Amino acid sequence: MQYTKSKWIKSEESILEANNESRPNLTKYSISLKPRIEAVLKQMDFQVSKFDKILNSLKSKDNELFRSIISSIKENNTHCYDKLLSDLLKSRKECKVVSLSKIVFEKLETKLKTASDFGDLVIILSPIISVVKNLRALLILYTPESEQELGLISELLGAILVDAAQVAGYTVNFKTANEEAMRLIDNAYLIVREKIKEEFSDLSDLSVLHSQRHLV
């Protein structure tokens, strides 16, 4: 059987030679790895595109709600103002979650593409799986279909991690992985906060305008 080298071959050879295993056994580790990683990246790319569409829709909704709130203030319609403001706040929360998910998934894609061997995969995948699970819990509140879609990604990543750890002889440190996952999410959230400030109207302007109208 002819064996085709891949970018994973260096780590595979070193692990298998250390265990005195024969070269043909390398095939079972290399055959399925690349297409499985590509499948995960394809799923992640689909999610990023989906997040983009949701964000565009939310931005349009936000602008419409903001204009309606301004009108309700001018008309002194307090009931309408309270209802619209509540809808706007809910929409902003969803926007933050979706923006966070988009930024994180883009970072995860970049990290996964930089993996050069099985050891890299274990180090990179360990926190990624934790991140995806955290995002899944947040997203299902706003996009229920994300539960199944992100569940599939988690399963694919988990299977790759198990195989990569076995070949590389690594033991996954879940405590460290979870800490790294939270750092990644926290850093992404800081970016989201700035983007929200830049791209959306300031809600404090509404409070000022509403107060002024009540004083008239």
Language-model features: locations:
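Amphipathic alpha-helical interaction segments
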Residues: K83-S86, L100-I103, K107, I123, ...
